[in-house]
From Swiss-Prot:
Its EC number is 5.3.1.1. It catalyses: D-glyceraldehyde 3-phosphate = dihydroxyacetone phosphate. It comes from the Bacteria. Homodimer. GO terms for biological process: gluconeogenesis; glyceraldehyde-3-phosphate biosynthetic process; glycerol catabolic process; glycolytic process. NCBIfam families: tim (TIGR00419). The lineage of its organism: Bacteria, Pseudomonadati, Planctomycetota, Planctomycetia, Pirellulales. Its main location: cytoplasm. This is Triosephosphate isomerase. Substrate binds at N10, W11, K12, G174, S214, G235, G236.
């Protein structure tokens, strides 16, 4: 079935208020009024409102990089789903490898955030991926399956079609290395097959699976042309208008 390509820019801990607003406006101009693909910008939480102002009334959507699973309360420094929707977010990135590695986030933690996101009418982008050591040990599929089953724990078939999976090989993030189109497609196909076993083939065909890992204008077309790659979660290349626009333009319209 046809799945609309989703290109999401993860700004990570970069930009400032003025430069972020300028970047967002530049991307809005580059995208135009009727893009063939869905475009999401995920700035640092302190700049969500400013970027929201820049994209309001345009096809470009707003996303967050994380959330806390609880509702209002004594959770200093945290931001919940209600707060994110309040400032205009529609998407939220969950379980990024940097948070798994640096913040000690577990699959169980990601699952709690997943359910909080869905309850708050956010579309979760759930990240999974293997390290170089795991790939070289031929453990990619077992690692991915463990992460997906754990991160989607308790998710029923009725809501499963509302999520996005992002496959981000850890060894390709910020390293300049990129999985070949064959490597990426093989893992994406495995993920879709796994989702079919967990839910149903029909639901698995609806779930978008992004690739993330040093996506650039120069490799975007060959990656996004693969049958099971439904978009990109873009890091460094989302910080420059021309680079991000190049990735968007490289995406097929189906």
């Amino acid at each position: 079935m046809s799945r609309r390509i989703l290109i999401a820019g993860n700004w990570k801990m970069n930009m400032r208020a003025e430069s972020g607003a300028s970047l967002a406006k530049g991307i809005v101009d580059a995208v135009g009024k009727s893009p063939a693909v869905e475009v999401v910008l995920c700035p640092p939480s302190v700049y969500l409102s400013g970027v929201a102002d820049a994209v309001v009334g345009t096809p470009v959507e707003l996303g967050a990089q994380n959330l806390y699973a609880a509702e209002d309360g004594a959770f200093t420094g945290e931001v919940n789903a209600s707060m994110l929707t309040d400032v205009g977010c529609r998407f939220v990135i969950l379980g990024h490898s940097e948070r798994r590695q640096l913040m000690g986030e577990t699959d169980a933690c990601v699952a709690k955030k997943l359910h909080a996101a869905l309850a708050g009418n956010l579309v979760p982008i759930v990240c999974v991926g293997e390290t170089l050591e795991q790939r070289e040990a031929d453990d990619t599929e077992s690692v991915i399956e463990t992460q997906i089953r754990g991160s989607l724990e308790g998710l029923d078939e009725a809501r499963a079609a509302n999520i996005v999976i992002a496959y981000e090989p850890v060894w390709a993030i910020g390293t300049g290395k990129t999985a070949s189109k064959e490597q990426a497609e093989a893992v994406h196909a495995f993920i879709r097959e796994l989702l079919g076993k967990m839910f149903s083939t029909e639901v698995a065909e609806q779930i978008r699976i992004q690739y993330g890992g040093s996506v650039k204008p120069g490799n975007a077309e060959e990656l996004l042309s693969q049958p099971n790659i439904d978009g990109a979660l873009v890091g460094g290349s989302s910080l420059k208008v021309d680079d991000f626009a190049g990735i968007i333009k490289a995406a097929p319209s189906a």
